[in-house]
Design a protein with these regions (language model features):
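Short-chain dehydrogenase/reductase
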Residues: 9, 13, 17
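C-terminal alpha-helical interaction appendages
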Residues: 24-26
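NAD(P)-dependent Rossmann-like dehydrogenase/reductase catalytic/cofactor-binding core
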Residues: 1-7, 28-29, 34-133
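Structural/interface elements that position substrates and couple domains in central-metabolism enzymes
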Residues: 16-22, 42
Length: 133
């Protein structure tokens, strides 16, 4: 059982890291704002992944189309090995998110209570996530 938990943790951590890196790159490259990304993830990817895993989704799309899409998109996806400048600047200036009241978003006390309540009740293993309304 412990080995299975380790495997699940490894998979989850790596998938989150890939999504995290690309989200930061989209903001850094001024392709989208944090709000844009949160909205898209909550209303598209998140909903799809709640009912089917990536391979189940790709099986429905068809591997020929997935291969074509991957051939184009993979050229554009970040492969940076370092955190983006905007993230380093925020951390260096003490903007740590909910903990300090600011990050990519400004957090009032009411916002902090709301986001913690939302994530605590979501079934997520995280007590606090990075989404904002």
């Amino acid at each position: 059982m412990a080995q299975n938990k380790q495997k699940v943790s490894l998979i989850e951590t790596r998938l989150r890291a890939a999504l995290f890196r690309e989200c930061l790159a989209l903001v850094e490259d001024e392709v989208a704002s944090p709000e844009d990304i949160d909205t898209v993830v909550k209303n598209t990817i998140g909903r799809r992944l709640a009912v089917g895993g990536p391979f189940e989704i790709w099986e429905q799309i068809g591997w020929d189309l997935v291969q074509t899409i991957a051939g184009e998109l993979f050229k554009e996806i970040s492969n940076s090995e370092e955190p983006v400048r905007s993230l380093r600047n925020m951390v260096n200036s003490g903007q740590l998110g909910v903990e300090t009241g600011s990050g990519f978003y400004e957090w009032s006390k009411e916002d902090v209570v709301e986001i913690r309540h939302r994530f605590d009740g979501s079934g997520s293993e995280d007590s606090v996530g990075g989404a904002h309304r």
